[in-house]
Amino acid sequence: MGKKFLVLCLLVGCSFSCAQQKVSFYSLKYKIFPKINIPSNSDVYMQKAALEFQKNFEILTKTKLTIEERTRFDKTENVLVLRVNPTQSSDFCIKKNKLNTTIVASSVENLHFGINEFFIKYTSLNFKQKSKQVGNPQLTYDIDLNSEINECYKADFSYREPYYSRNFNSDYSRWHKTNYLDLNWGIWGHNIPKILKKYQLPESAYAEVNGRRNKQQFCFSSNDLFKYLSTEIIKIYESDNALDRFMILPNDNFLSCTCDKCKKLGNTPTNASPAVFTFLNKLARKYKKLHFFTSAYNTVTEVPDFKAEKNIGLFYSTIKIQKGIPIEKSRYYNRFKKDITNWKDHVDDVYIWDYTVNFDNYFDLYPSLKVTQDNLKLYKKLGVHGVFLHGSEYNYSTLEDLKTYVFARMLWDTDIDLKEEITSFLNDNYSKKVAKLLSEFYIYLTDSFYNSKKELSIYSGIHQTAAKYLDPELLFTFYEDFDKYVQSNQYNQNYLQIATALTFLKLEIMRDYGFGKYGYARLFNNEIRVKSEIGTLLDKLDSYSRLAKISTYNEIQSSLRKYIIGWRETIFRYHRRNSYFFKKKFEVLSSLDEDYTNTSYLNDGAFGLLDYNTNWLLCSVDDLVLKVKKEDVKNSKEITFSFLQDTKHRIYFPEVIRIKDTENNTIKRFRLPVEKDKWLKKEFVLRLPTEYEDEQLSDEFIISIEKKRGIGKNTLAVDEIIFN
């Protein structure tokens, strides 16, 4: 299942029989060796394809086949014929007529896919053997094929890329029939400045914004920009003809050129599509063999009112609508369908840029395979030609080996049996018991993720992950079961990587739950008691991650070492500290940010770390002002505040904390010292009035936390407020 092919079954001997005669393709015993045939005067790319077949065959049989270049050959010869036919509709076909075996593809790239499919289907060679270059020791060294074969294969998408590190290996991508941008793209992303940095570009190459040239953006009606970029494009292509795709994107901002030429083409201060697509058309007409793409992004979101050339394509990003729910079942479907339909009317090649991990936490299992499968079926139905599945790039993410494999299979054929593929992969890569344990766990989570109606964005904290699909009881039980196998596989990278991720997830769940059964601590008579298990888990995370050579856990490369240090510092401070304000009611008197209204963060027992997505309440529209009842915290001697400073995101410590009565009279005032560290979490303690002081707390009192003043919109990040 999963392979798309047409089998022509020729009747042999009886019209009711589909049994075929076998002919020997290779036999060491009888000295039967096929020759690899490619056309006379083949280019280097065809020669590389022949070498791929030769290499695979040598790994399998320890026999090195001869490669010959000649266009004509005797049909009675035992030859493996490799050909490219750009006019055929199938990606590749495998054919046999008596002794001649032919693999013919629509492109050299597809020829590599066809060669590897030959070994998958007709021999015992698998990818593990190929990657280790060790064949099957039990092979009889005889390969027999049916005397007549005619099988043709066509993928559901012409461009298929799961963007995970395993797919960056060319052997892997060719074996699994995927694309890899380094092997296909001459220019990728927002890299025009990098490509042109060697030139001293004239002013006319830059955008005119508000009547002045601005070097932060390009002018896409500029003849100078076209001249310099054309020069670099042809240099790149001539250095490697496989690099025939070029992404032409404006710089990553919202500036649009409004010079006279661009305005005449249709540009406005917010829409650069007319000039960008005119520029693309000009490139496409000049280089008809190349393919040029842009992206529906920032100032290029409006469909131009003219048709793009046939060798122009567009990437459409799902970043704003990828919420862990199949798009067709979401509130975004109608808009999405309309957008794709509109773009398809003007651009022949529409590709989807999709997302398959939680970029805030690469250890989140994020089991979106079933959702992705539904989305791929939708993309196919809407006429999308290519899909780029953005994964964890060069970084490890949980079970990325499984996800890369399944996504590769799914991009080729959207109708694969998902459970069968998951089970098959795990059985091939883990012991029988561990494979069963992993399969049951992961398939259950995949179903839970798919069936949940709750949205989970690709930038989410553990709280949202747990609410969507990750039941703590299930995770903790699985953790104990899997960890037993890790102890006996301490030098196996796959086990260590999964153990690192699961330990991190368990700690995150415990941190988020705060106190109680699933939390990191318990509360006894208002005193925090940190569980002894936490120290063990932190030691394991440190050990597993070092052995697995994993040092970060998200897109912004947050350090695991700092994560562990942050945990240890926090539990050292928290253990046996009083907490009189835990989950007590309070009133918020200030305005809250639209996306940050969960004020339970302030006294739920959970604590934040250096990542602002971990239990921090962010306030940018106003200071934070709370009203608290004195009776609820009557035994407290002081208030301990936790704040975050992350200057990259304009998050700063507050300037002043005030305690006021309900008449707005100041009872206590504390000015915080200025901290120069750009990224820091810190506690500040404010002593409450003693019975001997003149100013006393009123029955209801106000806590006013005043954010840093200055130019621009600064943000305040507050975590636990502990009365102790």
Residues covered by each model-derived region:
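Feature activates predominantly on carbohydrate-active enzymes
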Residues: K29, F33, A49-E52, N56, ...
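Catalytic domains of carbohydrate-active enzymes that cleave complex glycans
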Residues: L411-D604
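Short, surface-exposed beta-strand/strand-loop-strand elements in extracellular ectodomains
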Residues: R650-N664
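Extracellular carbohydrate recognition and processing domains
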Residues: T666-Y692
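Short beta-strand-plus-loop segments that form exposed binding edges in beta-rich domains
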Residues: S704-G712
